[in-house]
Amino acid sequence: MERRHITLPLTKELARSLHAGDQVYLTGTIYTSRDAGHKRMCEALARGEQLPFDPTDATIYYVGPTPAKPGAVIGSAGPTTSGRMDAYAPTMMSVGARGMIGKGARLPEVVDAMKKYDGVYFGAIGGAGALLAKCIKKAELIAYEDLGAEALRKLYVEDMPLVVIIDSEGNNLYEMGKAEYLKEHGDK
């Protein structure tokens, strides 16, 4: 487990170099979407339409930020529960998206897709939306404005603190932590 500063895009090579448990400070362009936005994007793909952004090597942050205060780039921007995107994540990875930022566990189907497409799941700290917003230097609404907080946005972040929860080989920090605890403490 390392502490690393990485710059996007999240290429296949960069994704493969990350390991579950790595502390990462992320800099570059990311996109925001939650379940309503993911549903629309997957429906568009099913109709053969283009997405509102190029998904190649993209990282998607599962967030619905609050409105920005006067003079601020964005409001509070904490992660939402990633499981709500599990039905859509394999499709998004199949068209090139590689990174996902959120909180909580992922279904085995998502982990299988991550192994197939060299995806990485980063965990952001829940409840720290105001602090995470300080890492967001630019925010631009790009699609689905009618979804309000769930609209798609393009963000530029600097040194966003994250942890690799699941790496491109399927290693899962949550499972590793449980196994380590049981090894040390047994089934008590």
Regions found by a protein language model. Give the residues of each.
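A broadly conserved detector of short glycine/acidic/proline-rich loop/turn motifs that flank catalytic sites
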Residues: L10, I30, P65-P67, I166-G170
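C-terminal binding/interaction regions
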Residues: L26, K134-K188
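Feature captures the catalytic cores and cofactor-binding loops of soluble hydro-lyases/lyases
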Residues: T32-S33, G37-M160
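Short, structured beta-strand/loop micro-motifs enriched in basic residues and often containing a Trp
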Residues: M1-L10
